[in-house]
Structure formats: structure tokens, C-alpha cells
Amino acid sequence: MKLRPPRRFCRPLLFLLLALAVCVSAQSGAAKYAHPFEPSEELIYVGEFSRLLLKRVDVADFHFIATREPHQKVDGPATSAYALKLTGDISSRGFFSRLFNFHFHERIESTLEPVSFTVQKTKRIDEQGKRLRESEILFDQANGKLVWMERDPNNPAVGARSITTTFTGQVYDILSAIYFLRTQPLEVGKTIAVTISESGRVYRVPVKVIEKKRMKTVLGHVEVVRLDPGLYGPDGMVREPGQLSIWLTSDSKRIPVAARLKTEYGTFDITLRKIVARSQPKPA
């Protein structure tokens, strides 16, 4: 009999990997750029799993890249000469794939207007074993409306699912939500509310700033701040028990260096392993 993890096991892990890794795209701090993650940057993490006698077994690789790209045609005037493109790519590895005979791969591409920092479009590819889904979110921030569409490339006759949702204020996908947190004053004891769209629904996610401390990281011993996003619970994005914590450097770069997700299945530790400098010409 083959062991296969349920989908509700994979989704929280994928969210954790994305949330942590995208945060860290804030490494480069050159003052000549509008944001510390410009003009381009790549970040590499490793995810590990622990339960009982299993201690920090490799389960996933993930890479995240922030780049500039030329503006595409969108509703309303462009306020910048370029768009920001955030890309997150996550795949299973090693023990996890062999134990469960199961492969997952997720890729998200998010396009933002950099001056107003509003999301324009999100594309997603989600592979879990033989299951494959492609989805897209089109954001109309000015009119408070988004359209989510999902299709099964292996079964095109079924057609695409579509959900239209209205919202007030600023709404983000999971990538841009983390970038938004980096721009906020992270004062211990405060709670920051972030509105996130996931699978056609809109969630209000409270993010608590828990504490500051020193931590050993790939960057050395640095001061970090701990954030606890409220993703779990009956009204949360994940409707089962769990606790997610993310540690970011407390300086202006806000580099996420570690994260931990505790679930009924075990504990997942995510660790920054490498920051890759990438060169990219300025847009014309």
C-alpha cells in the first residue's frame, strides 16, 4: 500500500514555503532603487520535516526571484516605467518524495505596480502527484473587484471554474502580502491586518508581532523579529489546527531567515540557505 499525504497536508506546507521565501526577496538595499529587493534577486531555502524519531529530514527545495519587467497593458494609467514581477517556485525533494511516492510542485508569478504597490495579476501552477491545476487572478483594485479562474490542463473539456469577488481597501495575493508586511513598522505587541485573496475568496489575516531576539542564521548572529500570521482556525485560510511563526531580521531589510509550522502531522522548519545576487539592466 502506498502512503500518500492528504491535500490538506500539502497546502499548509506550500503556503509556509511561499510566505517565508517571498518575504526574503528584500535583501538588496541599494538606495538608488525604489525597493530593497530591486532590481533583481534570487533566494534559496530548504524545508525540513520532524516527527518523533525523524529529525529535520529534507522535504522541499524552493527558489524565489524578484525582477523588473516592462509594463503590460492594464486598466488605468501606469505610474511607473516598469512592473515588479515576483516568482516563487517550490518542489518536493529527497525523503518526502520517496516515503510517500508523492511529488508536489508549485509556481506563482505575481505582477505589481511598484509605486502604489498594488497587485495587477497572479498566475499559479499547482501540481500534487497526478493532479495539475492552473489558475489566474485578475485584480481591479480601482473598482474593488477580482476574478479568479482555475482550469485542469489534463481535462480541458470540463472548462474553467470562475469566481468574481468584491472587496474594499487593498487586497493582496500571498506573495505581495508578505512584501506589504516588510513595509510596516514591526513593533512588538502590535497586530497588523492583511487582506489576502486565495482561490477566489478574500480573507482578513491578523499578523501578530510577538518578540525580538538574537538568532544564528546564514547571515550570522542577528537580531530578528517574530511574526505569527493567524492562518488557522474555522474562519482562516487553513481550517485545521496549526501554528506558523516567521523570523525576519529586525533591520530595514526585513530578511526572513527562518520559519516553523507546527501541525498534527509534525513540524516543518524552513531555513534560508543562500542569497544569489542577480544583475538586470534597467528598463529603457
Question: Model-derived features: where do they sit?
Answer:
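Acidic, serine/threonine-rich low-complexity disordered tracts
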Residues: 27-139, 183-284
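N-terminal non-cleavable signal-anchor helices
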Residues: 23-25, 172
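N-terminal secretory signal peptides that target proteins for export/translocation
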Residues: 1-8
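Active-site/ligand-binding surface loops and adjacent short beta/alpha elements
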Residues: 140-198
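Bacterial N-terminal signal peptides
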Residues: 12-23
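Intrinsically disordered, low-complexity, compositionally biased regions/tails
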Residues: 8-14, 246
